[in-house]
């Protein structure tokens, strides 16, 4: 599944700047930030990336979520995110507090907008799901990175 998605992205002309297929919940591929508009054209129905800029650059990424796993109940201090379900269906829990709400199911083509600091959790359902995401950095002097994560709860003890 992971290599097929990677090859698919390359066939679209995307440059993959990093990847990690060893996460307990699945994995991700990071796309060259200079291709943010092309990424949006392919995965976000051509949404103008200039309308997404909050305080800095944009970082496109693909998440591949294994079936029947939950990512951390988490939030970010230096980014907001916009997601588009690309393949399959996925569960998502969202809240403005540490208390988890009910899971909502999103299908291919559905878009989700997460605010900076909003708690969220992706949940794999019956099959793999692929979610395109764009990080909307909120601090241009200190852009978000993989360390910008506050885990409120994590099934994997991280």
Feature map (PLM): residue ranges:
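Conserved short histidine dyad/triad with adjacent acidic residue
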Residues: 44, 61-79
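Short, surface-exposed coil-to-beta transition loops
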Residues: 58, 78, 116-118
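Short, surface-exposed beta-strand-loop junctions and turns on beta-sheet-rich folds
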Residues: 79, 91, 98-100, 129, ...
């Amino acid at each position: 599944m992971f290599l097929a998605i990677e090859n698919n992205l390359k066939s679209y002309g995307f440059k993959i700047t990093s990847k990690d297929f060893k996460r307990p919940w699945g994995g991700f591929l990071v796309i060259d930030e200079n291709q943010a508009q092309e990424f949006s054209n392919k995965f976000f129905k051509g949404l103008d990336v200039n309308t997404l800029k909050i305080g800095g650059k944009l970082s496109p990424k693909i998440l591949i979520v294994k079936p029947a796993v939950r990512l951390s109940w988490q939030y970010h201090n230096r980014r907001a995110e916009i997601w588009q379900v690309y393949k399959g269906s996925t569960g998502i829990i969202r809240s403005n507090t540490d208390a988890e709400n009910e899971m909502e199911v999103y299908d291919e083509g559905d878009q989700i907008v997460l605010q900076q600091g909003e708690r969220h959790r992706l949940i794999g359902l019956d099959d793999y799901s692929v979610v395109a995401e764009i990080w909307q950095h909120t601090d241009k002097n200190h852009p978000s990175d993989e360390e910008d994560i506050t885990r409120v709860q994590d099934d994997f003890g991280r």
